Amino acid sequence: MRIEEDLKLGFKDVLIRPKRSTLKSRSDVELERQFTFKHSGQSWSGVPIIAANMDTVGTFSMASALASFDILTAVHKHYSVEEWQAFINNSSADVLKHVMVSTGTSDADFEKTKQILDLNPALNFVCIDVANGYSEHFVQFVAKAREAWPTKTICAGNVVTGEMCEELILSGADIVKVGIGPGSVCTTRVKTGVGYPQLSAVIECADAAHGLGGMIVSDGGCTTPGDVAKAFGGGADFVMLGGMLAGHEESGGRIVEENGEKFMLFYGMSSESAMKRHVGGVAEYRAAEGKTVKLPLRGPVENTARDILGGLRSACTYVGASRLKELTKRTTFIRVLEQENRIFNNL
């Protein structure tokens, strides 16, 4: 047993210090990034925000809606090959270039993903997603995927420490997904005691990944556009959002009605709700590590997307970053004990 004495920080523990700026307007800020990925060699340009691969967020409808904002969607792994074919038949190449194909690590997952990728060459992203990215089996699967799809851009996770981030990049991942336990409907930290404050995880993993020419996506922990800005400020190349994009018309959650008011169910992918839906229930050897919440319907996702992008542009103007790429270089975090004046929050 050992104890690390260094303080680890989440988004709630810091604010970004403002700096002098020559920008005249938020409209002067360029949010689009251009990347060339280490292993695939593929180039991509767009706004580096990703809708999470949850079946109540990462839907085909979400992908179509967010593509118009140049935002990516990691489509959840529970669609059939036939459903993928129908989506591809009704989608433009511009939409498909904003789509990630999600997969688990079983042999069946691998074969299904292979079939999906064969449907259309415009599908360039694979998102290999497990709750615990520290297993040797997972590392071996990433290497297997890289060998099978040498020109596809592979995103793999989740991990929270630099050495495992390096391991995944060396095994073939272009982008490493960072985050264990910070999600709004994730209960891993309270069920297992395992986790890592998200901002510190992002800072440490970004440093490790960038040293090898890889990239990271901060996955989880964002509750406001300001948190998205902090993730980019901490060095994230991409930011993945779940709860912030849940509850919309495109989110795909089941709608329930209580006392005449409609709500949409949103649940973690290791929750009892998810396991009942996809694998018949919670196995006797494990515990559910997610919860289910009822969200008031939030309308079309375009309004939320505009709010997030607007907040991000504003953050850049406060520190004098004319491009999103510059935000991390212009960011100085200050530790704080409060984030906002909450006097009217309950009204």
From Swiss-Prot:
Transmembrane found in the keyword field: no
Keywords: Metal-binding, NADP, Oxidoreductase, Potassium
Lineage: Bacteria, Pseudomonadati, Pseudomonadota, Gammaproteobacteria, Enterobacterales
EC number: 1.7.1.7
Family: Belongs to the IMPDH/GMPR family. GuaC type 1 subfamily.
Subunit and interaction comment: Homotetramer.
Presence of keyword Transcription regulation: no
Protein name, per record: GMP reductase
NCBIfam families: GMP_reduct_1, PRK05096.1
Role, per record: Catalyzes the irreversible NADPH-dependent deamination of GMP to IMP. It functions in the conversion of nucleobase, nucleoside and nucleotide derivatives of G to A nucleotides, and in maintaining the intracellular balance of A and G nucleotides.
Reactions performed catalytically: IMP + NH4(+) + NADP(+) = GMP + NADPH + 2 H(+)
Chain positions recorded as NADP(+) binding sites: 108-131, 216-239
A molecular function GO annotation: GMP reductase activity
Active-site residues annotated for this sequence: 186
